[in-house]
Design a protein with these regions (language model features):
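Sec-dependent N-terminal signal peptides of Gram-positive bacterial secreted proteins and lipoproteins
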Residues: 1-26
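Bacterial lipoprotein signal-peptidase II cleavage site
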Residues: 17-45
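Short, well-ordered beta-strand elements
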Residues: 54-66, 84-90, 157-158
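Short helix-initiation/N-cap motifs at beta->coil->alpha
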Residues: 88-99, 187-215
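Ligand-binding "clamshell"
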Residues: 119-131, 146, 236-248
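A conserved helix-loop-strand patch within extracytoplasmic ligand-binding domains
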Residues: 131-180, 286
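A bilobed periplasmic-binding-protein/Venus flytrap-type ligand-binding module shared by bacterial periplasmic
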Residues: 138-150, 257-270
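Periplasmic-binding protein-like
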Residues: 168-175, 280-300
Length: 301
């Protein structure tokens, strides 16, 4: 820091000398640019000092691969500039990342939404909390050989995910498109299941595990439909623009099912967690999401 102070002092004296000699506007602009750059360097150095003050500059985060792991990889260098070493562990299920955070193996995870986190806490006696919403992945209704909702044939088969929160989203999407009717008070927070369907309009609705919906759709008969979560659609190579319908971005599903950063209760204000959140909620990340996922992933901060 003494070195930094010396640099700033030298720059200040230089600027005064140039002003006394009647320096040009261009020279003043150059000096201002140098001062701005130096200030930015000082801010980065200060962040690095905070990160390493207690030796805790490693951020261990668990995530599913698409898009969570990819987004984390994007911010890895940005966190390094702040003095943090982001270490990413990729999981292919929705149980182990929460257990790893609860057990202290990870500092945070990024793969789930709040309803799932609440359900996991209740079932496992854990105390994990959300510290930030990052994005949501719109559910899409896809048709095999069907080009519009109006063309869905009577008695068509519709496959939807079976777990509670995903089943709710799928059913709300089907209702949004007029394919089924649910109770008037049906909403994302309270949840619904196929047992709550008031009128299925003759469609054959079946539930399967969320991670198998895309595969079943790929092997389905012509005229069949499926409601697929955004990340599974991405992994299966489906383009959200080909979906017959997607969740309304202004609906409560977008906020309710936003993907979050989860940590142990009490860790919310750790410097490294604050750094992780602020970096993930930056304009650079929003632009990255917009440019790489074609609407299948939507920033929500």
């Amino acid at each position: 820091m003494k070195k930094l102070s010396s640099v700033l002092l030298a720059l200040s004296l230089s600027a005064l000398a140039l002003t006394g000699c009647g320096s040009s506007t261009d020279t003043s602009a150059d000096t201002s640019a140098e001062e701005t750059t130096t200030a930015a360097d000082a801010e980065t150095e200060a962040a690095a000092d905070e990160a390493t003050a207690d030796g805790d500059n490693v951020i261990k985060v668990g995530a599913t691969s698409t898009p969570h792991g990819e987004i984390l990889e994007f911010v890895k260098d940005k966190l390094a500039e702040q003095g943090y070493d982001l270490q990413i562990t990729i999981y292919d299920d929705y149980v182990l990342p929460n257990k790893a955070v609860a057990d202290g193996e990870l500092d945070a995870n990024y793969f789930q939404h709040t309803p799932y986190l609440n359900s996991f806490n209740a079932s496992n006696g854990t105390d994990l909390v959300s510290v930030a919403k990052i994005h949501y992945e719109p559910f899409g209704l896809y048709g095999n050989g069907v080009t519009s909702v109006a063309d869905v044939a009577e008695g068509a088969s519709i496959v939807i995910p079976a777990d509670d929160s995903n089943e709710t989203r799928a059913l709300l999407l089907l209702q949004q498109e007029g394919l089924i009717e649910l109770p008037e008070d049906a909403n994302a927070n309270d949840g619904v299941t196929t047992l709550d369907i008031v009128d299925d309009h003759g469609y054959n609705i079946t539930t399967v595990q969320a991670d198998t919906v895309a595969a079943q759709f790929a092997n389905s008969d012509a005229g069949s439909l499926a409601v697929i979560n955004g990340n599974y659609a991405l992994a299966a190579g489906l383009d959200i623009s080909t979906a017959l319908a997607v969740e309304d971005a202004s609906g409560d599903a977008a906020q309710t099912y936003a993907n979050i950063i989860a940590v142990r209760n009490g860790d919310e204000n750790l410097p490294k967690i604050r750094a992780l959140v602020s970096t993930l909620q930056s304009d650079d990340v929003k632009t990255y999401i917009e440019e790489n996922y074609n609407g299948a992933v939507v920033a929500i901060f």
